[in-house]
Protein backbone atom coordinates (compact mmCIF):
# COMPACT_ATOMS: atom_id res chain seq x y z
CA UNK A 1 0.00 0.00 0.00
CA UNK A 2 2.81 2.41 0.87
CA UNK A 3 4.43 1.72 -2.50
CA UNK A 4 1.23 2.73 -4.32
CA UNK A 5 1.05 5.95 -2.30
CA UNK A 6 4.69 6.64 -3.10
CA UNK A 7 3.95 6.19 -6.81
CA UNK A 8 1.07 8.68 -6.62
CA UNK A 9 3.21 11.12 -4.61
CA UNK A 10 6.08 10.66 -7.05
CA UNK A 11 3.93 11.40 -10.09
CA UNK A 12 2.40 14.44 -8.40
CA UNK A 13 5.81 15.79 -7.37
CA UNK A 14 7.27 15.10 -10.81
CA UNK A 15 4.36 16.94 -12.43
CA UNK A 16 4.80 19.90 -10.06
CA UNK A 17 8.54 19.97 -10.76
CA UNK A 18 7.99 20.01 -14.53
CA UNK A 19 5.40 22.78 -14.20
CA UNK A 20 7.77 24.91 -12.09
CA UNK A 21 10.68 24.21 -14.44
CA UNK A 22 8.64 25.42 -17.41
CA UNK A 23 7.55 28.52 -15.51
CA UNK A 24 11.10 29.29 -14.37
CA UNK A 25 12.43 28.78 -17.89
CA UNK A 26 9.93 31.26 -19.34
CA UNK A 27 10.65 33.81 -16.61
CA UNK A 28 14.42 33.45 -17.08
CA UNK A 29 14.02 34.21 -20.78
CA UNK A 30 12.00 37.34 -19.99
CA UNK A 31 14.43 38.25 -17.18
CA UNK A 32 17.37 37.94 -19.53
CA UNK A 33 15.70 40.17 -22.13
CA UNK A 34 14.86 42.75 -19.47
CA UNK A 35 18.48 42.75 -18.36
CA UNK A 36 19.63 43.42 -21.92
CA UNK A 37 17.05 46.13 -22.61
CA UNK A 38 17.87 48.15 -19.50
CA UNK A 39 21.06 49.43 -21.10
CA UNK A 40 19.20 52.11 -23.06
CA UNK A 41 18.72 55.22 -20.97
CA UNK A 42 16.35 58.02 -21.84
CA UNK A 43 18.05 60.90 -23.60
CA UNK A 44 15.63 63.56 -22.36
CA UNK A 45 15.71 63.71 -18.57
CA UNK A 46 12.16 65.14 -18.58
CA UNK A 47 10.84 61.78 -19.73
CA UNK A 48 10.13 59.42 -16.85
CA UNK A 49 9.24 55.79 -17.52
CA UNK A 50 5.99 54.55 -16.03
CA UNK A 51 7.80 51.71 -14.33
CA UNK A 52 11.39 52.03 -13.25
CA UNK A 53 13.34 49.31 -15.06
CA UNK A 54 15.36 48.48 -11.98
CA UNK A 55 12.16 48.07 -9.95
CA UNK A 56 10.73 45.70 -12.58
CA UNK A 57 14.03 43.82 -12.67
CA UNK A 58 14.06 43.40 -8.88
CA UNK A 59 10.43 42.25 -8.85
CA UNK A 60 11.17 39.63 -11.49
CA UNK A 61 14.26 38.53 -9.57
CA UNK A 62 12.14 38.09 -6.45
CA UNK A 63 9.55 36.03 -8.36
CA UNK A 64 12.24 33.78 -9.82
CA UNK A 65 13.89 33.31 -6.41
CA UNK A 66 10.52 32.21 -5.00
CA UNK A 67 10.01 29.73 -7.84
CA UNK A 68 13.54 28.37 -7.41
CA UNK A 69 12.88 27.86 -3.69
CA UNK A 70 9.65 25.99 -4.49
CA UNK A 71 11.47 23.79 -7.00
CA UNK A 72 14.18 23.08 -4.44
CA UNK A 73 11.50 22.06 -1.93
CA UNK A 74 9.86 19.72 -4.43
CA UNK A 75 13.24 18.18 -5.28
CA UNK A 76 13.83 17.59 -1.56
CA UNK A 77 10.44 15.88 -1.23
CA UNK A 78 11.26 13.70 -4.24
CA UNK A 79 14.58 12.73 -2.67
CA UNK A 80 12.78 11.52 0.48
CA UNK A 81 10.73 9.01 -1.51
CA UNK A 82 12.18 5.54 -1.88
CA UNK A 83 13.40 5.19 -5.49
CA UNK A 84 12.05 2.07 -7.18
CA UNK A 85 14.43 1.85 -10.08
CA UNK A 86 17.14 3.42 -12.17
CA UNK A 87 14.64 5.53 -14.12
CA UNK A 88 13.39 7.15 -10.95
CA UNK A 89 16.94 7.85 -9.76
CA UNK A 90 17.81 9.32 -13.15
CA UNK A 91 14.71 11.54 -13.09
CA UNK A 92 15.51 12.82 -9.59
CA UNK A 93 19.06 13.63 -10.63
CA UNK A 94 17.84 15.33 -13.79
CA UNK A 95 15.51 17.61 -11.79
CA UNK A 96 18.40 18.50 -9.47
CA UNK A 97 20.63 19.29 -12.46
CA UNK A 98 17.93 21.48 -14.01
CA UNK A 99 17.57 23.41 -10.74
CA UNK A 100 21.33 23.89 -10.55
CA UNK A 101 21.41 25.18 -14.15
CA UNK A 102 18.54 27.58 -13.49
CA UNK A 103 20.27 28.95 -10.38
CA UNK A 104 23.49 29.49 -12.33
CA UNK A 105 21.65 31.23 -15.17
CA UNK A 106 19.69 33.41 -12.75
CA UNK A 107 22.84 34.50 -10.91
CA UNK A 108 24.63 35.20 -14.20
CA UNK A 109 21.80 37.43 -15.45
CA UNK A 110 21.56 39.27 -12.14
CA UNK A 111 25.34 39.80 -11.97
CA UNK A 112 25.43 41.05 -15.57
CA UNK A 113 22.63 43.50 -14.78
CA UNK A 114 24.48 44.80 -11.71
CA UNK A 115 27.72 45.19 -13.69
CA UNK A 116 25.91 47.04 -16.49
CA UNK A 117 24.17 49.33 -13.97
CA UNK A 118 27.50 50.09 -12.26
CA UNK A 119 29.12 50.82 -15.63
CA UNK A 120 26.25 53.14 -16.64
CA UNK A 121 26.46 54.96 -13.29
CA UNK A 122 30.19 55.43 -13.73
CA UNK A 123 29.84 56.65 -17.31
CA UNK A 124 27.05 59.00 -16.27
CA UNK A 125 29.18 60.57 -13.56
CA UNK A 126 32.13 60.92 -15.96
CA UNK A 127 29.86 62.63 -18.51
CA UNK A 128 28.67 65.07 -15.84
CA UNK A 129 32.26 65.85 -14.85
CA UNK A 130 33.19 66.46 -18.49
CA UNK A 131 30.18 68.73 -18.98
CA UNK A 132 31.03 70.63 -15.79
CA UNK A 133 34.64 70.99 -16.93
CA UNK A 134 33.52 72.30 -20.32
CA UNK A 135 31.20 74.82 -18.67
CA UNK A 136 33.88 76.02 -16.24
CA UNK A 137 36.64 76.16 -18.85
CA UNK A 138 34.30 78.00 -21.21
CA UNK A 139 33.85 80.70 -18.60
CA UNK A 140 37.60 81.07 -18.04
CA UNK A 141 38.37 81.88 -21.67
Language-model segments: residues:
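Regulatory linker/N-terminal fringe of the SNARE motif in t-SNAREs
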Residues: 2-16, 23-141
